[in-house]
Amino acid sequence: MTSTSKDTPESGYAVPPPNLFGVDFGLRLLLLASAVSALVVLVTSKQTESIPTSLPPPFPAFISRDAKFQHSPAFIYLLVALSVTCFYSIITMVASFAAITSPSSSPRMLFHLVLSDAVMAGVMASAAGTAGSVAYLGLKGNSHVNWNKVCNVYDKFCRHVGSSAAVSLVASVLLVSLVVLSSYSLYRRCR
């Protein structure tokens, strides 16, 4: 008995679609690690500096100013997106582990993973882009609107915020990879 289909071997039995949930679980574990590390780096971004003033002598020559992530709505948005991504990755790791232990996974679950991963990828990409643009503005300033750069004064703060935005971008790439992987798995199961 010969078959023209590539999925049917010589014995006549259909080859099951590849189970990629081990790779899925590993990517979700990396997603959790990157989101937690970006979250910790962002939360610890605080620096206090003494800044000289140009006021006459009865006033103090230096004032103390803090730079915190709470001072920027873009960084607060990144904090919320990273927190949601952490919880999301934990929940989907449990679902992925359940799919590994079960003999056959449901196409419905794969479809839900594709949709939710795509939404989370959009949220993380927008948060990373927003925080990255504010960090770049702090690094370079904007001479057209007379916004001065602040990273020459708050160097530690800028390193923390920039690192957090970069690791958040890695989390976004991992989420896009999960969308591609889940889409491929769904395609193989429904074919």
UniProtKB/Swiss-Prot annotation:
Sequence ranges on the Extracellular membrane side: 44-73, 140-160
Quaternary assembly: Homodimer and heterodimers.
InterPro entries: CASP/CASPL, CASP_dom, CASPL
PANTHER family to which the protein is assigned, alphabetical: CASP-LIKE PROTEIN 1U1
Keywords for the protein's UniProt record, in alphabetical order: Cell membrane, Membrane, Transmembrane, Transmembrane helix
Listed name of the protein: CASP-like protein 1D1
A Pfam family it matches: CASP_dom
Keyword Ribosomal protein: no
Topological domain spans for side Cytoplasmic: 1-22, 95-118, 182-191
GO cellular component, one term: plasma membrane
Signal peptide: none
Stretches that traverse the bilayer: 23-43, 74-94, 119-139, 161-181
NCBIfam families: A_tha_TIGR01569 (TIGR01569)
UniProt-annotated location(s): Cell membrane
UniProt membrane topology term: Multi-pass membrane protein
Family membership noted in the UniProt record: Belongs to the Casparian strip membrane proteins (CASP) family.
Domain of life assignment: Eukaryota
